[in-house]
Amino acid sequence: MPSAKSPRRKAPEPIDLDNPQYYFNRSLSWLEFNKRVLHEAYDPRTPLLERLKFMAIFSSNLDEFFMVRVAGLKQQVESGILQVGADGMPPAEQLQAVRQYLLPIVTEQHRYFDQELRALLAKESIFLTRFNELTPEQQAYLNDYFQAQVFPVLTPLAVDPAHPFPYISSLSLNLAVLIRDPESGQERLARVKVPNQFPRFVALPQHLHSPQGVHWLGVPLEEIIAHNLSALFPGMEIEAYFAFRITRSADLELETDKADDLLIAIEQEIRKRRFGSVVRLEVQRGIPPLLRQTLMEEMDLEEIDVYELEGLLCLNDLFAFMGLPLPQFKDPEWQPQVPPSFQRVEERESMFDTSSEITTLGTDYWEAVANELFSLIREGDIIVHHPYHSFAATVQRFITLAAHDPQVLAIKITLYRTSGDSPIVSALIKAAENGKQVAVLVELKARFDEENNILWARKLEKVGVHVVYGVPGLKTHTKTVLVVRQEAGQIRRYVHIGTGNYNPKTASLYEDLGLFSCREELGADLSELFNVLTGYARQRDYRKLLVAPVTMRDRTLQLIYREIEHARNGQPARIIAKMNAITDTQVIRALYEASQAGVDIDLIIRGMCCLRPGVPGVSDRIRVISIIGRFLEHSRIFYFGNNGDPEYYIGSADWRSRNLDRRVEAITPIEDPAIQLELKERLEIMLADNRQAWELQPDGTYRQRQPAPGEAERGTHSVLMARTLKDVQGSH
């Protein structure tokens, strides 16, 4: 008899990598990130005042989320846009999901602050108390403060047929007051804005502290106003009062390629922003339904837009407590260090008397110190890591020395965000006054920094700086400086290419990297990039730089697919990428293909991550962590194993569609072996973190790593601070 044939095994169905189930929604992923920020406020290992800071950061982040993301989703719904992202969730569904996810989180935040953090503060003699809990003497002091300081500033606004509902500014704190006319018995509504010219939390003087030894004792300003409402409405009965706050859309609607004058167009849009549509209403719990309904109707809001919360509103203002001189309740102070590579410059500088004003230092000083710095860069590439390394002693010094050095002919820089009293801008003004060619790209569309940047643009233009506002249709996000210097009869170009803004204030809080180099190819690339930004050049390729929106997407995909080829050929294949967010579908799909091919992938993503790790057959070999702590992780680092010949890159871009397609970005290769080793070690420290790292689970939640029993804590920030001190001390 013929033998029975064994049944043929059916080939597995190919996995559809475009299936929405393999992608997280970016709005919900962002909310997960902010939830990790809030966890720092709940974590008893976080110093007490730092816990208030994280409460404030969470609330401030959330304000921006509503002003931009929720406002954008609402606009899509109103415009009938049904387009969905890779996760397949339409805008209306996203708004519902945001509400469903967020309401319990903010409810718990307010409960925790009101019931638990306030008690913890009181235990440490920091009393944020209620007005009616004060002694008569303390109340009298605050009533006098109200009459002398606050009352003259207040403008109570009635709401009735003769007084239409007043304009409410975005994010302002207000009191809705229900008053009753005792003669007519008629109830009326009034609004009192809590002025922001005064401290939100009003401190009582030391002599009124009871008992003595109290660190701080104070009351929220709105409670002082509320207990003095009779002074604002004499002859009326105060029936009830409740705090409320609104959030308006802050998205600029600007067609940059159609604007004749971008600066004027943006100024006009900023003015319009004040009147953006209301996207959220926050009210104190217990507000009468009629009052709540009136506010909703006047703001044209639905139930989904209203958040009824316990206790204080606007917890952003808790930032103020970080100003208390109580170091025992804060993180140990960190002093950014001068990196060993820059200590030579410090030593050269110390040979001069620098006690006088910087403007009086002579040419011999500037020449000597600048020569030291530029010769240092000529000896080899240098990388600096902020805030471990001092921004003032490295990047700021580089720009300041270039501004004064007689041999420097030109300085070109991109400014995305800088500080209000920017020494960078001051140095650029000085460079122009010293007769150098100075070109500055000021990105006017840097969200919420538009007014600041307009101010600097005008100031720079006044002294003859060539100021440009970017490329039409694109936002310039690259962090680059080009210094052109005359040396021994030849021109040499020096560059700084970084991951963070040229902002001294955020440089002490944000973790960022910067490369100093005088490699000819990088200098040539940066010259051509600035020509694109300031002129009409259309550069299609670059020697070394990955530039968006020209080469970065294609080159990134090539690097991923090269690792796939190595894995398919049985060779080692590895990708490590650190950035703020990954949301681009094409890049995520390529990473899924890499995982399927056998490439080991570690992603260090602080914020949004639409990639779903750990899915069998799709992303088994992809691991994602997020590091949250005292510094904001902001650097972008990319490592590709390349079969034992690794390539490293740093730069300004995340793997998001906006960075790859709608922004001017620059990523530079790191080719110096010593710097490559340094980056590798720093990535390994982050991947080994068991204190600040959170692991992304396949269901979209995050699990915080904890040290095993008997294992020492390895927090990225504390490890790198200790390592920096050791490196600096070892170099002396």
Swiss-Prot record:
Reactions listed under catalytic activity: [phosphate](n) + ATP = [phosphate](n+1) + ADP
Annotated stretches, region: Disordered: 699-718
Top enzyme category: transferase
Keywords for this protein: ATP-binding, Kinase, Magnesium, Metal-binding, Nucleotide-binding, Phosphoprotein, Repeat, Transferase
Modification note: An intermediate of this reaction is the autophosphorylated ppk in which a phosphate is covalently linked to a histidine residue through a N-P bond.
Cofactor(s) the protein needs: Mg(2+)
UniProt-listed Enzyme Commission number(s): 2.7.4.1
Family of this protein: Belongs to the polyphosphate kinase 1 (PPK1) family.
UniProt cross-references to NCBIfam families, sorted A to Z: poly_P_kin, PRK05443.1-2, PRK05443.2-2
Protein name, UniProt field: Polyphosphate kinase
Annotated organism of origin: Thermosynechococcus vestitus (strain NIES-2133 / IAM M-273 / BP-1)
